[in-house]
Amino acid sequence: MHRLRQCNMKWGAEEEKKIELQAQGLQPDTLFSDVIKRYLNKITPTKRGEKHEFNRLNRFLRHPVTDKYISDVSRRDIEDWIAERLESVKSESVRRELSTIGHIFKIALERWGYIQKSPMVGIQLPEKGKPRTQRVTEENINAIVAISEYVDTLKTAKARTAAAILFAVETAMRAGKICSLSWGNVNFEKRTAFLPMTKNGTSRTVPLTKNAIAILERLKVEIGDAGLCFDIKSSVLDATFRKLKKLAEREYLHFHDTRREALTRLSKKVDVMTLAKISGHKDISILQNVYYAPDMAEVAELLD
């Protein structure tokens, strides 16, 4: 009898909460997971980072917190998720994921009327980790190229991945932009590559070194100029790069390290403003602190 009374009291409290939410024009009994799915269908496709956000949110949907009603998700729930997530990934990854989760609650509050207050209020973001400073040495590059078949052919994914690595070190282009580079956006006469839409939301033109041009000319001969220059999807490039670096015993490398290497090399040839134009950085401090990684021994030689 006592248990029945407790159940009735709990049910009554839930019903009161529903009535209260409805009186405020909010929608009770909506699962957090359903709101996330609506966001995936309506908001995520409008973003340039659609693919990455889709993967992030589908992973998040496997977490028990998404089984709660969105109106019941608390700040403590989010803080517990942060602590749990930090056990398996770096703080930068958690900060990115929190940005998306925070926007879901913002849309749920301001546009869809699911909640009257966001549980993200007062949430402390994990501290930013130190910027990565790893560069790609000639030894690293040679070790990967040596096992890639690049010297003999460009008809395999391994060989074209090696070509992309070499091209990245020459141009400072990101992996995604290399994979999407089309022949129509390459000007061999002016030695430039036009990138119509970049990470910062603008287009830019990248100058091409003689080595970069040589890579493209070889691709044109061996692969043809009917499709994209490197004829490789981003997902395939990523998977193949992981295999190659493991075989070459260079698992500590990230493809993005080639961008830092390229910009450090280019900094010896052009001024910082030109370097920012090449890289697409609007904030010079980010360029200097994150991507420019000079060898101080080389700098010392320049001082003599």
Curated annotation (Swiss-Prot):
Residues spanning the membrane: none
Any one Gene Ontology BP term: symbiont entry into host cell
CDD domains per record: INT_Rci_Hp1_C
Active site (catalytic residues): 174, 199, 256, 259, 281, 291
SUPFAM superfamilies: DNA breaking-rejoining enzymes (SSF56349)
Residues annotated as domain Tyr recombinase: 131-304
Claim: DNA-binding is one of the keywords in the record: yes
Gene Ontology molecular function: any one: site-specific recombinase activity
Domain (Core-binding (CB)) ranges: 30-109
Superkingdom of origin: Bacteria
Family: Belongs to the 'phage' integrase family.
Organism, as annotated: Haemophilus influenzae (strain ATCC 51907 / DSM 11121 / KW20 / Rd)
Official protein name in the record: Putative integrase/recombinase HI_1414
Keywords from the UniProt entry: DNA integration, DNA recombination, DNA-binding, Viral genome integration, Virus entry into host cell
PANTHER family assigned to the protein according to its UniProt record, in alphabetical order: INTEGRASE_RECOMBINASE HI_1414-RELATED (PTHR30349:SF94), PHAGE INTEGRASE-RELATED (PTHR30349)
